[in-house]
Amino acid sequence: MDMIKTEGLTKVYEGVKAVDSLSFTVGKGEVFGFIGPNGAGKTTTIGMMVGLIEPSAGKCLVKDVDVTRNPMEAKRITGYLPDGVGFYSVLTAKQNLKYFSKFYEMKDSDADKRISWLLQYVGLEKVEKPVGSYSRGMKQRLGLAQALLNDPEVIFLDEPTNGLDPQGVIQFRKIIKELAGNGKTIFFSSHILDEVRHVCSTIGIISGGKIIAQGSPDEVRRKMLKDSNVTITVKVPGSMPKLEDSRIVTAQYNGSSAVFTASEDIRGSLSEELFRKGVWVRELTLEEKTLEDIFLETLYGGA
């Protein structure tokens, strides 16, 4: 079942398309990683998906509810952790959550039980000081508790690990995996690939307001590798003969070995040619770029 579906989702500011015709789906229990550099359109997209920004064109459905036409119904089944979440600084975590529970028309007894459980879940049950004295990581954990307050089926997280220390990132990953394991659908944005690939079943890479690749991490890597060369190293017992193949881009020979860059994996062809020449292959290895390498080169022009 598709819990999130966008159809031609577009936002135009002063004639410039900040988000350009996004169409994708996210299934139940799926963790979708929405990745791209700052300014790519991630926050604007999420703003439209949670009903805070009106699309210029297209629509977003959350569990078949049109977010723009039925924002209150969509709010009932969604949770949202914005980048730079804000709270009342003079109130405690419990007091802040109790205030927000009013927006969901929760009974006091139900709200108290839910808040107590959530604070324990995010590790803030023993913190009684005002939120204004919280660290960045503590505020993010409280923000997650607020996003889960109404026990939503779909959760939107905008740069949730931004500014967290390594331990905080690990804690967030653990919670996200637990939520997905319990059937929650999670839409998770970040500008750092490593922060989402550990928990996401599907990723979408956005640049200039457009999704340039989408699928599982392996599928995205293969798709983005189509225009990228591979490196093949060949070693033989004696002298390395010259090898010919139209797909070879460069070749470097050094005694009993050679390193080729090629437009695709040609190990089979190289092995067959060496066999025809009566040369035994001692080593034949392929080196492909990692998803991180491709991501950095495509969006940032390299590391």
List each model region and its residues:
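Short, charged/small-residue-rich alpha-helical element at the C-terminal edge
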Residues: 226-303
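Solvent-exposed, charged/polar functional surfaces in cytosolic regulatory/catalytic domains
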Residues: 121, 175, 223, 269, ...
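ABC transporter nucleotide-binding domains
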Residues: 2-6, 11-207, 213
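Short, Lys/Arg-enriched, disordered terminal segments
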Residues: 1-4, 301-303
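Generic structural signal for individual residues within well-ordered alpha-helical segments
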Residues: 75, 97, 112, 170, ...
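ABC transporter nucleotide-binding domain
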Residues: 173-261
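Alpha-helix capping and helix-coil boundary motifs
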Residues: 70, 107, 221-224, 266
